[in-house]
């Protein structure tokens, strides 16, 4: 059985910013937590309502992943969750004074920096690294995901955007480690198509969206502050989202994840299937 020491932050750290969808200023505080706490969100503006970062608490997957407990919600958790899970942080309290996690620059970069600033310490209790007892898959229309037994966490993703010549078809495959995530995935920003913007705004989304936290793709080019961080930044960001969503399984695991055109809803659906076949 694979196992390692549980990990938490060495000290408390704080970050303030704007939520990309609701457009509200928010402050998050990451606090060290004792062994076997897990990752828990806490709405500091609502008498400390606790929301565990687990699949049963997912309540919405429209353009981001939202968790809830009782009447409390916490939205757009995936970029922070990807950073915590890729850094092997098992136990942390995330306090937020609003209903949405700040978006930063649209990537996981700010959260990786927070973890670096806080420092990481090992704890006395161990955590087992789960494996898949059998392959599982999820398919819906043009979306396909599968998870295969593997000795490491590997993600292979195909992004196909025929409606956007500037994105087209992109493919990347990474073995996910703290280093590969930090260098190859964490800097990659969320993106949208130019012709989607009105639709998103009509739905009350991207209220805090701007070129400081997103990349916009037009048929004839890219609207961005500076150049793309990678030529295939969109597919890398999709991998980032997938890591964040699958972290809601609630325990570290190894598998080879193969994804074609997945989003938050299908990522969560695969996560639920993975949870059914994890061992030990």
From Swiss-Prot:
GO terms for biological process: lipid A biosynthetic process. The keyword Metal-binding applies. Zn(2+) binds at residues 79, 237, 241. It catalyses: a UDP-3-O-[(3R)-3-hydroxyacyl]-N-acetyl-alpha-D-glucosamine + H2O = a UDP-3-O-[(3R)-3-hydroxyacyl]-alpha-D-glucosamine + acetate. Pfam families: LpxC. Pathway: Glycolipid biosynthesis; lipid IV(A) biosynthesis; lipid IV(A) from (3R)-3-hydroxytetradecanoyl-[acyl-carrier-protein] and UDP-N-acetyl-alpha-D-glucosamine: step 2/6. One of its GO terms (molecular function) is metal ion binding. The keyword Coiled coil does not apply. Its EC number is 3.5.1.108. Its cofactor is Zn(2+). Keywords: Hydrolase, Lipid A biosynthesis, Lipid biosynthesis, Lipid metabolism, Metal-binding, Zinc. It is an enzyme of class 3 (hydrolase). GO terms for cellular component: membrane. The active site is at 264 (proton donor). Belongs to the LpxC family. Catalyzes the hydrolysis of UDP-3-O-myristoyl-N-acetylglucosamine to form UDP-3-O-myristoylglucosamine and acetate, the committed step in lipid A biosynthesis. NCBIfam families: lpxC. This is UDP-3-O-acyl-N-acetylglucosamine deacetylase. It comes from Chlamydia abortus (strain DSM 27085 / S26/3).
């Amino acid at each position: 059985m694979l196992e390692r020491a549980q990990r938490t932050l060495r000290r408390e750290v704080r970050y303030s910013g704007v939520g990309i969808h609701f457009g509200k200023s928010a402050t998050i505080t990451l606090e060290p937590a004792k062994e076997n706490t897990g990752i828990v969100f806490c709405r500091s503006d609502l008498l400390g309502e606790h929301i565990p970062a687990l699949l049963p608490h997912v309540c919405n997957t429209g353009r981001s992943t939202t968790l809830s407990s009782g009447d409390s919600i916490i939205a757009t958790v995936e970029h922070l969750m990807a950073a915590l899970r890729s850094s092997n942080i098992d136990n942390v309290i995330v306090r937020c004074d609003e209903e949405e996690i700040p978006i930063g620059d649209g990537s996981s970069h700010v959260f990786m920096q927070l973890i670096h600033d806080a420092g990481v310490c090992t704890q006395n209790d161990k955590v087992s690294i789960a494996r898949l007892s059998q392959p599982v898959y999820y398919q819906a229309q043009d979306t396909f995901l599968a998870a295969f037994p593997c000795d490491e966490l590997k993600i292979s993703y195909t992004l196909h955007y025929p409606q956007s010549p500037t994105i087209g078809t992109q493919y990347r495959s990474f073995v996910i480690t703290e280093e590969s995530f930090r260098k190859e995935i964490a800097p990659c920003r969320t993106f949208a198509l130019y012709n989607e913007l009105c639709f998103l705004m009509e739905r009350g989304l991207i209220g805090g969206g701007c070129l400081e936290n997103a990349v916009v793709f037009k048929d004839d080019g890219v609207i961005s502050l500076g150049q793309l961080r990678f030529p295939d930044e969109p597919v890398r960001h999709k991998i980032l989202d997938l890591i964040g969503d699958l972290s809601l399984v609630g325990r570290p695991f190894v598998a080879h994840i193969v994804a074609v055109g997945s989003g938050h809803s299908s990522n969560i659906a695969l996560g639920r299937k993975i949870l059914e076949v994890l061992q030990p």
